[in-house]
Swiss-Prot record:
Keywords, sorted A to Z: Membrane, Transmembrane, Transmembrane helix
Record family assignment: Belongs to the UPF0591 family.
Residue stretches spanning the membrane: 14-34, 80-102, 122-142
Protein localization: Membrane
One cellular component (GO) term of this entry: membrane
Domain of life: Eukaryota
Organism lineage: Eukaryota, Fungi, Dikarya, Ascomycota, Taphrinomycotina
Protein name, per record: UPF0591 membrane protein C15E1.02c
Location, primary (coarse class): membrane
Membrane topology: Multi-pass membrane protein
């Protein structure tokens, strides 16, 4: 009886690399590279009030949800690279652009027209999303996601 797998195998180290890449990209984009622009964009944004719960619980929840969503994103991009047979950096760049077009571009349009966000906010979010999709796919293909 043949064995069918619906989810391709991705090395756990590739997922960990993706998590590290995403956190490093967030640190660089929201920190040294565009931190001042981000602070200006957030100072003009309307503040959202949250319930007065435990700050430790909020931080833990935020970090765990970010970690899990980044792990899923890393697995998904690695699986997509594997299933499409991508072996070159150029191919990985285009796969990353397709992922950005499917996931990041609708957010940019939403920020512009629905939420009427300012240009600095849209700029930082777009660059962050682009780095996290295109950069992650290039980093993963450079690492060697595919089985040979």
């Amino acid at each position: 009886m043949p064995s069918y797998t619906h989810m391709p195998y991705v090395r756990p180290s590739a997922i960990l690399l993706g998590i590290a890449f995403d956190h490093a990209a967030s640190f660089l984009v929201y920190g040294p590279l565009m931190g001042d622009i981000w602070k200006r964009a957030m100072s003009t944004a309307p503040h959202v009030e949250y319930d007065a719960g435990s700050k430790t619980k909020k931080v833990a929840t935020t970090y765990v949800s970010n970690f899990l969503s980044t792990a899923v994103q890393s697995y998904s991009i690695a699986a997509l690279l594997q299933l499409t047979g991508t072996v070159t950096l150029k191919g990985a760049f285009f796969v990353g652009l397709y992922v950005f077009g499917a996931s990041g571009l609708p957010d940019v349009v939403d920020y512009m027209f629905t939420e009427s966000r300012g240009t600095p906010y849209i700029l930082v979010k777009t660059i962050s999303s682009l780095v996290k999709s295109v950069g992650l796919s290039v980093a993963l293909i450079g690492y060697g996601v595919r089985r040979i």
